Amino acid sequence: MKSYVLSAASAIAIISSSAAFADGHVSPEAEVLHYWTSGGEAKSVAVLQEEFAANGGIWTDMPVAGGGGDAAMTALRARVLSGNAPTAVQLKGPAIQEWFNEGVLADISAVAEANNWADLLPTSIAAHMQCEGTWCAAPVNVHRVDWIWANAEILAANNIEMPTTWGEFNAAAEKLQAVGIIPLAHGGQAWQDATVFETVVLGLGGAEFYQAALVDLDPEALTSDTMIAVFDQMRTMRGYVDDNFSGRDWNLATAMVMNGEAAFQIMGDWAKGEFVAAGQEPGVDFLCASTPGDGYLYNVDSFAMFEVDGEDKQAGQALLAELVMGPNFQEVFNMNKGSIPARTDVSLDGFDACAQLSAADMSSTSEDGTLMPSYAHGMALFGAQSGAITDVVTAHFNSDMSSAETVQMLADAITNSM
């Protein structure tokens, strides 16, 4: 009940502040906490800052680098506990619901309903943006997580095709390793280990197994022979990374592929933003393909608005929400970011072949039931459960634990996190 009362109050405040802004009585202000700090990401968020300023807004940037957003969430928690929440925060998936349940999110339904968001968003994505019937977040994009990126020149020089099975990937990696090329650019950070892990789960087990294991947390799936095979593949892939991988940021791993130091990287399509920002072209300088297997893992970036005082800040929330879902921003931002628009009515004519493939695959997997939320990127589970899985995954990746031992540890960790 507390959440509902706060949301209703914030909705009235945002409506009033929007009217005051329209009448020129207030200047919209927004302090925006986000973790878009790499080259391609910074270029993308600059688009939103420019649009906000062009509409009379005053933007205070609060970027927090590191940890795939973990550091940003730590900073957010400290701000909320001190009673000084930012105006808007980059949040996604169940984390939005968790903050809503704490009664600290603002209701942006007035903006959403005035702009017909329900008709513009895929049902699955709209569901992530709503909290008990109210709109509490604005989606920016749809990222595909299960991508494999490659240096086109390296593959051509070694007569290697983009792998379509994990066996083909392993064979290519061993061939590259034999001639002194790092097969897999990887950063030894827990979230990056988890990113690779979930693509292997989807690839070896299929969407139904992925759903059972990493969404439903079914104990039989978690300790199955299929999960043992997943960890066997992770152990094999550990041998394909270089000795200096520990602690490397993801964009530095992308740079290894760009610069010809490594052949492949497994990473979401924000990596494409790095290639593009460096002036590289898909199909010419780098190659993109879904990781081996069927299905699609999605990650949706979004902004949630927090309860704040002051008409200027509330007007800033209304303006920011409207701009985030605006067709111009959705097009320009996603071209820079490497993702595809959350809105279904934005033309993809100007997008590259990788984005076209992503959009086509999202449509087909949505129809056949193999469109899956990314656990590693906060779309499938609450933090305690996803953290428990990731701890086990990274412990296995950085040790000599057997796969059989690891799956039991995985099941136990999830049980203890409940």
Question: Where are each of the predicted segments found?
Answer:
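Extracytoplasmic/periplasmic substrate-recognition and gating elements
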Residues: E50, A54-N55, S82, N158, ...
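Glycine-centered hinge/linker elements that transmit conformational signals in sensory
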Residues: A173-L176, V215-S246
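Extracytoplasmic/periplasmic solute-binding protein
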Residues: T134-V140, D146, N170-P219, A262
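Mature extracytoplasmic/periplasmic domains
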Residues: G39, L105, A110, N259, ...
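C-terminal capping/gating helix-and-loop segments adjacent to ligand/active sites or protein-protein/ligand interfaces
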Residues: P139, L297, A342-V346, A359-M418
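Conserved N-terminal structural module of periplasmic/extracytoplasmic solute-binding proteins
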Residues: A9, A22-E98, E102-V104, A114-N116, ...
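Extracytoplasmic/periplasmic substrate-binding proteins
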Residues: Y35, V196, D232-D312
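Hinge/lid segment of periplasmic solute-binding proteins
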Residues: P94-D146, N170, V196-E198
